[in-house]
A protein has these predicted regions:
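Thiamine diphosphate
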Residues: 1-133
Length: 133
């Protein structure tokens, strides 16, 4: 993965122009709450470099995965399995944010809003996930 924006407390793996944009809005919003988010663009959603992933998550205990499609069989499933296989989860918390029902139709932003994976809803979920208020 490629570091789009560096951070030190939470890492979020995502891909694609729309989701990167949403993550950068999320990063700015969370910065105001005192959280420092690292944003990673995954050019390949089904193959991962062990050394690269180790470097990305080093010293980070909260891992998020964001994708704008169905959860089952997506990057979140694959990356979570990869992390577990290589014993990289340890005490880290991991959360997958994706679409868990048949996707609604509309503009990209309308779909994100409906499924609550837009930056405002994600911020609330991440704050609860991190138990930081």
């Amino acid at each position: 993965g490629n570091v789009v924006s560096d951070g030190s407390e939470i890492v979020i793996f995502t891909y694609g122009q729309h989701m990167i944009s949403e993550c950068l809005k999320l990063k700015n919003f969370l910065r105001e709450k005192g959280l420092n988010l690292k944003v990673i663009n995954m050019p390949n959603v089904n193959s991962f470099s062990l050394n690269r992933i180790k470097k990305i998550i080093k010293k980070i205990n909260f891992i998020c995965i964001l994708e704008d499609h169905m959860r089952d069989g997506g990057m979140g499933d694959l990356l979570t399995s990869f992390l577990a296989e290589h014993n990289l989860l340890n005490k880290r918390k991991i959360k997958n944010f994706s679409i868990d029902a048949f996707p609604k139709c509309g503009t990209h932003q309308e779909v994100l809003n409906y499924h609550k994976i837009d930056f405002k809803n994600l911020a609330q979920k991440i704050l609860r996930f991190k138990k930081f208020k």
